[in-house]
Curated annotation (Swiss-Prot):
Lineage of source species: Eukaryota, Metazoa, Chordata, Craniata, Vertebrata
GO CC, alphabetical: cytoplasm; cytoskeleton
Encoding gene per record: Ppp1r18
Phosphoserine: residues carrying this PTM: S126, S134, S174, S194, S224, S412, S510
Organism, as annotated: Mus musculus (Mouse)
Acidic residues: bias regions: 353-364, 558-571
Designated name of the protein: Phostensin
Signal peptide: none
Record localization: Cytoplasm, Cytoskeleton
Length: 594
């Protein structure tokens, strides 16, 4: 006897899982019916009576079909080998079922109210179809049905006020049903607001997502427009939809995200304020908006904010990290400039655009002699705090150039600082460069890629033409100055190579400073002897057939052209000398024009 194939075992296991799920749903349905109030049971009984079902029958479940004799097609389906797709019995049954459902949906849209009971009876005659059907096909059919059902339900709820006298009589039978009618508009609003919930709600109205064909057809026949009174749900159902709806969850999630974002920004601001040393400025709570921070600033900040209201408004509108330089800091710098304190107050990075706007407003508010000082002193350093020492020394240097009481000596002056003039006090230079922020150090490169530094001290030294110097002084000057220096044309004497290799462009910089660099060495005697070119006269004596005719060296191009013309005339006049003259002319042309 052959072993059972794997696909058949998988099919049997899937069928067992489906049966277990169906049994669980049956149990849940029975529990729900036992806990249901009497008025709702009466509504369900009236629905069954309209559909033509016996009134005493319980909830239609597929377990009743399982108790009967097995379907004759079932054994054939399980024993059949999987052949081509179009001949598979599962595929054929699924196609028939889909065609029936599409036809039924068309009938529902057209208002055919008799399709529901006929379909119920048809499905009850062949209950084995449900078990042959795979769960994926069932889920896809439910998803196909649910948007149309939701649309039909919306239409029915919209026309619920124009109900017939029969449905009004049904509602008058119990006052609790009249109360239930009042919950209709809220449900309609929920269905319109959240279309993603329509599959779950359509299944819940049928009863806890039951997959039985009778229950589905009950639900579909409910949706006919003439019976709006039958679609009222119990308050428990309304309560379930309220609990299970995703809109309050979405709103609460949005609120949580908003509070998290505010808390995060508040924590960042608090960390920054503690790092800057201004701990007296506390945030009242993590959800304080950014524009309310003006109320927390100290009294001196309030005064300066009154002096410049637009500037303080701009700073408070920026984020917590960009709001580093307050108006109080700018005022203290302009009134009593203390460079080390200002450099300590601005250790962190800042927004470049906000700084430029603030500096423009400062330049308009203050007088001209203070512009250069503000541009050089009030700009916060974008480098980490370890560079604040060099910034402080640079500001001390600039203030020492102005007529002020002497400050302590600079800590680490750059090498080019003593020789370069300092036109920082010039109002013309400050007017030119007031929009550009100077760098953190005099010679240090800027690390931000969006702004460039214009230092006016670089272009100030006068250009004095230096006389040709000897190699020793050239080397000393090259090693003394900080930048790279190339030798001039007067300093180089070429004899097939450079006299000193340290002055050639093969060596980048002087070898005295770069000890680890590659050292290149040639033997100068070999270069001198090897690359010595022979004279043209000797070459012509070796190659030319007539050495008795001397050839003068051609100095310039016009002389060469004149001689060529003369040679052409000689060729025309003396045809006997054509060969020798032509050979020598070619040799001269090749040697000179290269």
């Amino acid at each position: 006897m052959t072993a059972i194939p794997d696909w058949k075992l998988q099919l049997l296991a899937r069928r067992r899982q489906e049966e277990a799920a169906v049994r669980g749903r049956e149990k849940a349905e029975r529990d729900r019916l036992s806990q249901m109030p009497a008025w709702k049971r009466g509504i369900l009984e009236r629905r069954r009576a309209k559909l033509g079902l016996p009134p005493g029958e319980g909830s239609p479940v597929p377990g009743n079909a399982e108790a009967g004799p097995p379907d004759p097609d079932e054994s054939a389906v399980l024993l059949e080998a999987i052949g081509p797709v179009h001949q598979n019995r599962f595929i054929q049954q699924e196609r028939q079922r889909q065609q029936q459902q599409q036809q039924q949906q068309r009938n529902e849209v057209l208002g055919d109210r008799k399709a529901g009971p006929l379909e119920v009876l048809e499905r009850r005659s062949s209950p084995g179809n449900l078990r042959d059907q795979s769960p994926k096909g069932r889920e896809s059919r439910e998803e196909r049905l649910s948007p149309r059902e939701s649309r039909d339900r919306r239409l029915v709820i919209g026309g619920a006020q124009e109900s017939s006298s029969r449905s009004l009589r049904d509602w008058r039978q119990s006052p609790a049903e009249a109360r239930d009618l009042s919950s209709r508009p809220a449900e309609a609003q929920k269905w319109r607001l959240s279309p993603g919930e329509t599959p779950e709600e359509s299944l819940r109205l049928a009863g806890s997502g039951d997959d039985s064909p009778k229950r589905k057809e009950v639900l579909e026949s409910i949706l006919s427009p003439g019976e709006p009174g039958d679609q009222k749900a119990s308050p428990t159902d309304v309560h379930k939809w309220n609990l299970d709806s995703r809109e309050p969850q979405k709103q609460s999630l949005i609120q949580l995200e908003a509070t998290e974002w505010r808390l995060k920004s508040g924590e960042e601001r608090k960390d920054y304020l503690e790092g800057c040393g201004r701990e007296e400025e506390k945030l009242s709570s993590g959800i304080v908006p950014v524009t309310k921070e003006v109320q927390d600033i100290t009294s001196s900040e309030v005064e300066t904010a009154e002096q410049r209201p637009t500037e303080s408004w701009k700073w408070t509108l920026n984020s917590g990290k960009a709001r580093e330089r307050t108006t109080w800091d700018i005022d203290t710098q302009t009134q009593k400039p203390d460079p080390p304190a200002s450099s300590e107050k601005h250790p962190g990075p800042s927004g470049m655009e906000a700084e430029e706007e603030a500096e423009k407003e400062e330049a308009e508010a203050q007088s001209r002699p203070l512009r250069a000082q503000q541009n050089l002193c009030s700009g916060p350093s974008p480098l980490p705090p370890e560079h604040s020492g060099t910034e402080g020394s640079r500001q001390q240097e600039e203030e020492a150039a102005e007529p002020r009481p002497p400050t302590p000596a600079p800590l680490s002056p750059p090498p080019s600082a003593p020789t370069a003039p300092q036109p920082s006090g010039d109002p013309l230079m400050s007017r030119l460069f007031y929009g550009v922020k100077p760098g953190p150090g005099v010679g240090a490169p800027r690390r931000s890629g969006h702004t460039f530094t214009v230092n006016p001290r670089r272009c100030a030294p006068p250009a004095s033409p230096a006389p040709p110097v000897n190699p020793a002084t050239a080397d000393a000057a090259g090693s003394g100055s900080g930048k790279k220096r190339y030798p001039t044309a007067e300093e180089i004497l070429v004899l097939g190579g450079y006299l000193r290799l340290s002055r050639s462009c093969l060596v980048k910089g002087s070898p005295e400073r770069h000890h680890k660099q590659l050292k290149i060495s040639f033997s100068e005697t070999a270069l001198e002897t090897t690359y010595q070119y022979p004279s043209e006269s000797s070459v012509l004596e070796d190659l030319g057939p007539e050495p008795e005719t001397p050839i003068a060296p051609l100095a310039t191009q016009p002389d060469e052209e004149e001689e060529e013309e003369e040679e052409e005339e000689e060729l025309l006049l003396q045809p006997g000398l054509q060969g020798g003259l032509r050979t020598k002319a070619l040799i001269v042309d090749e040697s000179c024009r290269r």
